């Protein structure tokens, strides 16, 4: 009896299965009345429907143009797209010290707060003089992760710790507008019988070319070379300009006023005449009746000067009587070596002045000329010359314009302005012709000789120095 009952139960279960399936699963025509989905591809109304980022880019893969149609904004599209393509790189917050992260495709960019740098803003920036000269008006020095400003002689540091305040009426490097147009009559000129080339404990000596090591590539550079196509320098606009006068009363070179007793010039100028006098404060040297000649007491030539190649072409003249400063006579400031190399010589232009030839084969000028000359990078400088450009030299000029220093300008100033202060950066030395295409003027690099200049001036300072001077 039991087997028969079990068989009946099995048959009953099998008979009920189709009915159970029909109760659970609806037929397709019935199901479609409840479940409907609009087809995406090739829909007739697809292009006229308003953009929807979920429909466009979530339900299916979209292009950047489709995303742009949704946002109608390039910036929002870029922000979405960088995350959509490969995820948000900024989710891990990779930027340190509260830096702001911006996602990119396969990368990210951190915008750091002031004082931090690096890909992830991970480096604390030490205050550096290389950044805007530490905001210093003159000289900058890094001290224990901070910057310390200082000023040229004749200036004091302002209370803000950055500015430099002139202490006198004629502090160095200042161009002062003259109110007095009258020039007083000055004594007749008189020449010193001679001047001495002093050996200052091996700091200076007269160098014979035959004993020097020649550094040239071929023949010697043009002697006494070094304004062509310059503008007239008005009275008071080049107040540091000195003119060298020979024993015949003729101008033959230039110099830069450093203090009441000292004038900077080129070493090769010392070989041009038996005696030297200096004139300052003039822009027209044809007016000999207004000249006041300052007699050279001693001349200090750099001990490493090479006459054949103009290497170390620098000298200092000490005057018997001091220069009287005025609106038209002001010394140039002497920079520190670091300030000259890292700040001044990275400016676009320097200023060159002189009474030299107006063109290569022309006559010298009675009127002081001035030009702006751009600094030339060292590689271009070396390629342009047939002669070796030593570390004590630099190039300035246009290369493709006839504006240059020329014969008779030798020893004159190359000045660079920083703010309202003018610093001596070079000495007109030599060149291959004047204003030739592809050629530049060669200048003695003053920053290489700052310790030498200061030593000469300190050791040979007259005890009767005028109080108007600035060393």
Swiss-Prot record:
InterPro entries on file: Coagulation_fac-like_Gla_dom (IPR017857), EGF-like_Ca-bd_dom (IPR001881), EGF-like_dom (IPR000742), EGF-type_Asp/Asn_hydroxyl_site (IPR000152), EGF_Ca-bd_CS (IPR018097), GLA-like_dom_SF (IPR035972), GLA_domain (IPR000294), Pept_S1A_FX (IPR012224)
EC number(s) per entry: 3.4.21.6
Sites of 4-carboxyglutamate modification: 46-47, 54, 56, 59-60, 65-66, 69, 75
Signal peptide: 1-20
Disulfide bonds: 57-62, 90-101, 95-110, 112-121, 129-140, 136-149, 151-164, 172-333, 233-238, 381-395, 406-434
GO molecular function, one term: serine-type endopeptidase activity
Chain ranges of the Peptidase S1 domain: 227-458
Active-site residue list: 268 (charge relay system), 313 (charge relay system), 410 (charge relay system)
Maturation propeptide residues: 21-40, 182-226
Top-level taxon of the source organism: Eukaryota
Annotated Pfam families: EGF (PF00008), FXa_inhibition (PF14670), Gla (PF00594), Trypsin (PF00089)
BP terms from Gene Ontology: blood coagulation; induction of blood coagulation in another organism; proteolysis; venom-mediated blood coagulation
Catalysed reactions, as listed in the record: Selective cleavage of Arg-|-Thr and then Arg-|-Ile bonds in prothrombin to form thrombin
Coiled coil spans: none
All copies of domain EGF-like, residue ranges: 86-122, 129-164
This protein's GO CC annotations: extracellular region; extracellular space
Primary location group: secreted
Keyword terms: Blood coagulation cascade activating toxin, Calcium, Cleavage on pair of basic residues, Disulfide bond, EGF-like domain, Gamma-carboxyglutamic acid, Glycoprotein, Hemostasis impairing toxin, Hydrolase, Protease, Prothrombin activator, Repeat, Secreted, Serine protease, Signal, Toxin
Residues bearing attached sugar chains per UniProt: 92, 271
Location in the cell: Secreted
Modification(s) after translation: The vitamin K-dependent, enzymatic carboxylation of some glutamate residues allows the modified protein to bind calcium.
Assembly and oligomerization: Heterodimer of a light chain and a heavy chain; disulfide-linked.
Protein's job: Snake prothrombin activator that attacks the hemostatic system of prey. This protein is functionally similar to blood coagulation factor Xa.
Family according to the record: Belongs to the peptidase S1 family. Snake venom subfamily.
Extra remark beyond the main annotation: Is classified in the group D of snake venom prothrombin activators, since it requires the mammalian factor Va for maximal activity for the cleavage of prothrombin. In contrast to blood coagulation factors that circulate as inactive zymogen in plasma, venom prothrombin activators are always found in the active form in the venom.
Protein's name in the database: Venom prothrombin activator vestarin-D2
UniProt lineage: Eukaryota, Metazoa, Chordata, Craniata, Vertebrata
């Amino acid at each position: 009896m039991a087997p028969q009952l079990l068989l009946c139960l099995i048959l009953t279960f099998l008979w009920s299965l189709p009915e159970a399936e029909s109760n659970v699963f609806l037929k397709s025509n019935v199901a479609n009345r409840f479940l409907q989905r609009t087809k995406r591809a090739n829909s007739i109304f697809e292009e006229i429907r308003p953009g929807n980022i979920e429909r466009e880019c979530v339900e299916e893969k979209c292009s950047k143009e489709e995303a742009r149609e949704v946002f109608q904004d390039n910036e929002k599209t870029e922000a979405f797209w960088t995350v959509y393509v490969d995820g948000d790189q900024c989710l891990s917050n990779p930027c340190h010290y509260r830096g702001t992260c911006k996602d990119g495709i396969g990368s990210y960019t951190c915008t750091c707060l002031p004082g931090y740098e690096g890909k992830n803003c991970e480096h604390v920036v030490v205050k550096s003089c290389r950044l805007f000269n530490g905001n210093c008006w003159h000289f900058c020095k890094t001290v224990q992760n901070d910057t310390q400003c200082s000023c040229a002689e004749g200036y004091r540091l302002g209370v803000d710790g950055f500015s430099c305040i002139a202490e006198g009426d004629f502090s160095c490097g200042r161009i002062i507008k003259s109110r007095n147009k009258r020039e007083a009559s000055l004594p007749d000129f008189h020449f010193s019988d001679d001047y001495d080339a002093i050996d200052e404990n091996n700091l200076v000596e007269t160098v014979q070319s035959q004993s020097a090591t020649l550094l040239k590539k071929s023949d010697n550079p043009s002697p006494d070379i070094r304004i062509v196509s310059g503008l007239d320098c008005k009275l008071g606009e080049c107040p540091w300009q000195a003119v060298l006068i020979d024993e015949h009363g003729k101008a033959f070179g230039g110099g830069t006023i450093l203090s009441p007793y000292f004038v900077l010039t080129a070493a090769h100028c010392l070989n041009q005449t038996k005696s030297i006098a200096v004139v300052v404060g003039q822009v027209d040297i044809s007016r000999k009746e207004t000249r006041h000649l300052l007699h050279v007491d001693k001349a200090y030539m750099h001990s490493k000067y090479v006459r054949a190649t103009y290497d170390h072409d620098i000298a200092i003249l000490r005057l018997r009587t001091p220069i009287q400063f005025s609106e038209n006579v002001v010394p140039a400031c002497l920079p520190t070596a670091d300030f000259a190399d890292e700040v001044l010589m990275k400016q676009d232009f320097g200023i060159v002045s002189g009474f030299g030839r107006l063109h290569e084969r022309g006559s010298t000028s009675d009127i002081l000329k001035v030009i702006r000359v751009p600094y030339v990078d060292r590689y271009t400088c070396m390629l342009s010359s047939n002669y070796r450009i030593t570390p004590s030299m630099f190039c300035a000029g246009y290369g493709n314009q006839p504006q240059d220093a020329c014969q008779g300008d030798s020893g004159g100033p190359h000045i660079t302005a920083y703010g309202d202060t003018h610093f001596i950066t070079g000495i007109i030395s030599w060149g291959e012709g004047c204003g030739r295409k592809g050629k530049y003027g060669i200048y003695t690099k003053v920053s290489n000789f700052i310790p030498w200049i200061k030593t000469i001036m300190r050791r040979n300072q007259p005890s009767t120095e005028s109080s108007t001077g600035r060393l």
